[in-house]
Amino acid sequence: MPTIQQLVRKGRKDKATKTKTPALKGSPQRRGVCTRVYTTTPRKPNSALRKVARVKLSSQMEVTAYIPGVGHNLQEHSIVLVRGGRVADLPGVRYKIVRGALDTQGVRGRQQARSRYGAKKEKK
């Protein structure tokens, strides 16, 4: 434990907090270009084919981003908007693609939680 005199001289150092989304460089979202669109399998208790894309961001970093929702229209060279948010059962996936923004279409026929998936209200 420091003495009062040592605290007067040096003071306390703040602990630097580590960011969970370093590739966004402090921005809420970043634009990027898909370099590869593929499926991958989740960690142990779960079983599925999760849709993910490798994206080269405008911050010059390449990240793996999850494509949420049922079905998608993404392919190589698609321009996408990437936000933070990890997928718990996919190791190394710390970003999600925003549906309904740029080249990504919203989920067709979605009636609940539409704004999360960029789905327009269906006509009656």
UniProtKB/Swiss-Prot annotation:
Superkingdom assignment: Bacteria
A GO CC term assigned to this protein in UniProt: small ribosomal subunit
Keywords: Methylation, Ribonucleoprotein, Ribosomal protein, RNA-binding, rRNA-binding, tRNA-binding
CDD domains, sorted: Ribosomal_S12
Listed SUPFAM superfamilies: Nucleic acid-binding proteins (SSF50249)
Modified residues (3-methylthioaspartic acid): D89
Gene Ontology terms describing biological process: translation
Record field: compositional bias (Basic residues): 111-124
rRNA-binding found in the keyword field: yes
Chain residue ranges for the region called Disordered: 1-32, 105-124
GO MF annotation, one: tRNA binding
Listed InterPro entries: NA-bd_OB-fold, Ribosomal_uS12, Ribosomal_uS12_bac
Disulfide bonds: none
Gene3D superfamilies assigned: Nucleic acid-binding proteins (2.40.50.140)
NCBIfam families assigned: rpsL_bact
Physiological role: With S4 and S5 plays an important role in translational accuracy.
Subunit description: Part of the 30S ribosomal subunit. Contacts proteins S8 and S17. May interact with IF1 in the 30S initiation complex.
The family this protein is said to belong to: Belongs to the universal ribosomal protein uS12 family.
Official protein name in the record: Small ribosomal subunit protein uS12
Provenance organism: Beutenbergia cavernae (strain ATCC BAA-8 / DSM 12333 / CCUG 43141 / JCM 11478 / NBRC 16432 / NCIMB 13614 / HKI 0122)
Underlying gene: rpsL
